[in-house]
């Protein structure tokens, strides 16, 4: 039986205090289950093989051992967290510097979008190309989306614990959802306009040498700048900056397609221009529809992968030897991070102070994980009861 903590002990309880240096035979230990170097060297099947259904016996074996390696690495990570009491990572100063860098990336992207939009407006007026106009309208939406993403980032940095007690991190996927919806709507409008042009009686498309030079020069310059912004923004892990990177990459594709459509329409036939615009529109709808689905899943509370739940269960069981059972381990998305619910069973005669300290330290330990925004640890003395929440499975 666990003895209650002495009254004169410190109020702040270390995450390491419960482990001590005594007997650890009660803990799960996978140190003896190491994958041989022979199997570590086996490469998992490529995505192409997986998609085509061309997995042979060797591919399945390699995939199995890859999963085992990842599982053992995950358990090792949990052991390091339990032993050190913290997750190795950036210091407060490094985090502040990273936040400043992310803000700078957003500002650079917004300024570049304004300048490039002005250049593409001139190219659209000069060429009259539907494909270039479609690309220019996309740049206009870049400015609008930039404002949306900036607003969500600003909202997240101004907490209000009374009106928003669990924070505003849901603003991030909501902003991306609005952005994606506007982009998909633009794509549909471009398709309708392109079809109208193809069915109209006006069937000519001609550019002078001077007009062609201006259009090609502007579009190539814009594409190069956007490509540099893609590489810059992809170096960050922040979801908003990554959304900018995706948008810049999309611009690179649309600029190239628009430029090719203009040149071919000028030298071959007029219909290539509206066809190029339709291709851009379909690409827009597909890209941002996938973005919508991804962010919807993050808001509706999709469960974490079984492999991640394994890691959490392992961490919970090894937290304290007084834990008799683990009743529930849940992790589900609530924005870009996980909410975690854990039910552990402790001895019925354990003093409240000791039980509280065990549960609180487990909660703090779980919240040290980068993917977890908030953890809830529920303490119980038995596990045969019905669910506490009347609508827990609705």
From Swiss-Prot:
The keyword Transmembrane helix applies. Residues 1-103, 152-172, 234-251, 295-394 are cytoplasmic. It is found in: Prevacuolar compartment membrane; Golgi apparatus membrane. It is a multi-pass membrane protein. Its main location: membrane. The chain crosses the membrane at residues 104-124, 131-151, 173-193, 213-233, 252-272, 274-294. It holds the Pfam family ZT_dimer. InterPro entries: Cation_efflux (IPR002524), Cation_efflux_CTD (IPR027470), Cation_efflux_CTD_sf (IPR036837), Cation_efflux_TMD_sf (IPR027469), CDF_Transporter (IPR050291). It comes from the Eukaryota. Residues 125-130, 194-212, 273 are vacuolar. Widely expressed. Belongs to the cation diffusion facilitator (CDF) transporter (TC 2.A.4) family. SLC30A subfamily. This is Metal tolerance protein 11.
């Amino acid at each position: 039986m666990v003895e209650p903590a002495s009254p004169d002990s410190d109020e702040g309880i270390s995450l390491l205090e419960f482990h001590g240096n005594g007997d650890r035979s009660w803990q799960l230990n996978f140190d003896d289950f190491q994958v041989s170097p022979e199997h570590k060297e086996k490469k998992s099947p490529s995505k192409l093989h997986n998609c085509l259904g061309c997995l042979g016996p060797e591919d399945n074996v390699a995939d199995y051992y890859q999963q085992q390696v990842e599982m053992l690495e995950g358990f090792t990570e949990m052991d390091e967290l339990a032993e050190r009491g913290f997750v190795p990572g950036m210091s407060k100063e490094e985090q502040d510097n990273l936040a400043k860098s992310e803000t700078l990336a957003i500002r650079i992207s917004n300024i570049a979008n304004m300048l490039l939009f002005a250049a593409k407006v001139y190219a659209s007026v000069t060429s009259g190309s539907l494909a270039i106009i479609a690309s220019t309208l996309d740049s206009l939406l870049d400015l609008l989306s930039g404002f949306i993403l900036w607003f969500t980032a600003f909202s997240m940095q101004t907490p209000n614990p009374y009106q928003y007690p669990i924070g505003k991190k849901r603003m991030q996927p909501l902003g991306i959802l609005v952005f994606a919806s506007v982009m998909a709507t633009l794509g549909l409008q471009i398709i309708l306009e392109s079809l109208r042009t193809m069915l109209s009686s006006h069937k000519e498309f001609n550019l002078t040498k001077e007009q062609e030079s201006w259009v090609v020069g502007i579009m190539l310059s814009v594409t190069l700048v956007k490509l540099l912004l893609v590489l810059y923004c992809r170096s960050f892990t922040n979801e908003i900056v990554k959304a900018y990177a995706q948008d810049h990459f999309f611009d690179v594709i649309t600029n190239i397609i628009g430029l090719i459509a203009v040149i071919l329409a000028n030298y071959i036939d007029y219909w290539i221009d509206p066809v190029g615009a339709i291709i851009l529109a379909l690409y827009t709808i597909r890209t941002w529809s996938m973005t919508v689905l991804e962010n919807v899943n993050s808001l509706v509370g999709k469960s974490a992968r079984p492999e991640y739940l394994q890691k959490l269960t392992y961490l919970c069981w090894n937290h304290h030897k007084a834990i008799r059972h683990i009743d529930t381990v849940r992790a589900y998305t609530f924005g870009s991070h996980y909410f975690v619910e854990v039910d552990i069973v402790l001895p019925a005669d354990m003093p409240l102070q000791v039980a509280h300290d065990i549960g609180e330290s487990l909660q703090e330990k779980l919240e040290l994980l980068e993917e977890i925004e908030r953890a809830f640890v529920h303490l119980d003395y038995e596990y045969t009861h019905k669910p506490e929440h009347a609508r827990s499975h609705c």
